[in-house]
């Protein structure tokens, strides 16, 4: 995997995400929670085995006392100019919300990987839905979905490239257990692929924004409403441009690796009268069904949603058959 040659490997979704995250970051602040635990465990194991990232450095992996602590360390690492990541789900993601607002507000480039899981209400459930991801829609993070193990590996790298350029943090998510623990045969990205996708000038720009006593500036102040309002508005152009930035990263990935993705992908009859809109693992099943029905002459189709936030309604409508 560490060579320049692409290989076919058998792994699950968690390992696929952790593989790219460990290779393209320098710090991982973790606290395991089902079903995301293996991502942190893989990262911890690879660091203990002295596996380098794509720059030849050994990433620092630190387990904190809770997800709240993990997100605080994660935020701090980003402020120090490190390329940092974390992995979580469900209640763990909820504990990260305060720092997620800070990370997005400061326009930090980063990718967090989430194996989406039900939130505890009248009872706890470790199984999968998107309740946790839906709870963080207002934090200012981009939300990017993967539907299969191959997509997890691909989207993890696409997200890393896009966030460095767009400066909007990305929450990359996939269905807990159904995809996080699905074992599949995939084409593993090589370190050369990752180096081709990551722009070192953008990495340097991220480092240059770090808090540094040799280049002091103020951040994290208390502001009155007039100033606060203007600062909030000044972030919007980054958010509005992020969808195009993600598509640009997808296009670059297609040139480097060969697999093509779009923010919304349509499969099915060009004259479909009935269309399913799906995000996550269900899209895989729906696609097989659609292809089977279309072969029998049915006018049906499927729109697969990849970038859920920012949601580009115009591109969604363009993806639908005319």
Which residues fall in each region the model found?
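Glycine-rich beta-alpha junction loops
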Residues: 117-118, 174-181, 280-282
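Conformationally flexible catalytic loops at phosphate/diphosphate-handling active centers
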Residues: 55, 170-265
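Thiamine diphosphate
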Residues: 1-135, 140, 157, 177, 251-322
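Short, solvent-exposed amphipathic alpha-helical segments in soluble enzyme
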Residues: 44-47, 101-104, 160-162, 187-190, ...
């Amino acid at each position: 995997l560490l060579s320049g040659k692409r290989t076919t490997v058998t792994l699950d979704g968690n390992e696929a995400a952790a593989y790219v995250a460990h290779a393209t970051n320098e710090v991982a602040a973790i606290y395991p929670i089902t079903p995301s635990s293996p991502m942190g465990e893989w990262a911890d194991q690879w660091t203990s085995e002295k596996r380098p990232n794509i720059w030849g450095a050994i990433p620092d992996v630190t387990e904190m006392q809770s997800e709240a602590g993990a997100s605080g360390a994660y935020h701090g690492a980003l402020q120090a100019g490190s390329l940092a990541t974390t992995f979580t789900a469900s209640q763990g993601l909820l504990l990260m919300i305060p720092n997620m607002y800070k990370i997005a507000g400061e326009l930090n480039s980063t990718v967090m990987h989430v194996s989406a899981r039900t939130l505890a209400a009248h009872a706890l459930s470790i199984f999968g839905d998107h309740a946790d991801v839906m709870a963080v829609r207002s934090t200012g993070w981009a939300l990017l979905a993967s539907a299969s193990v191959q997509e997890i590996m691909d989207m993890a790298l696409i997200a890393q490239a896009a966030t460095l350029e767009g400066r909007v943090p990305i929450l990359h998510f996939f269905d807990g257990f159904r995809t996080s623990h699905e074992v599949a045969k995939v084409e593993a990205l090589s370190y050369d692929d990752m180096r081709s996708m990551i722009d070192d000038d953008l990495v340097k720009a991220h480092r240059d924004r770090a808090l540094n006593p040799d280049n002091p500036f103020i951040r994290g102040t208390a502001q009155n409403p007039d100033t606060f309002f203007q600062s909030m508005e000044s972030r919007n152009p980054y958010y509005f441009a992020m969808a195009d930035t993600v598509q640009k990263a997808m296009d670059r990935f297609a040139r480097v690796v060969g697999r093509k993705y779009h923010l919304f992908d349509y499969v099915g009859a060009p004259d479909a009268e009935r269309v399913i809109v799906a995000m996550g693992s269900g899209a895989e099943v729906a696609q097989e069904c659609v292809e089977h029905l279309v072969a029998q002459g049915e006018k049906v189709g499927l729109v697969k949603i990849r970038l859920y936030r920012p949601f580009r309604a115009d591109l969604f409508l363009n993806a639908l058959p005319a």
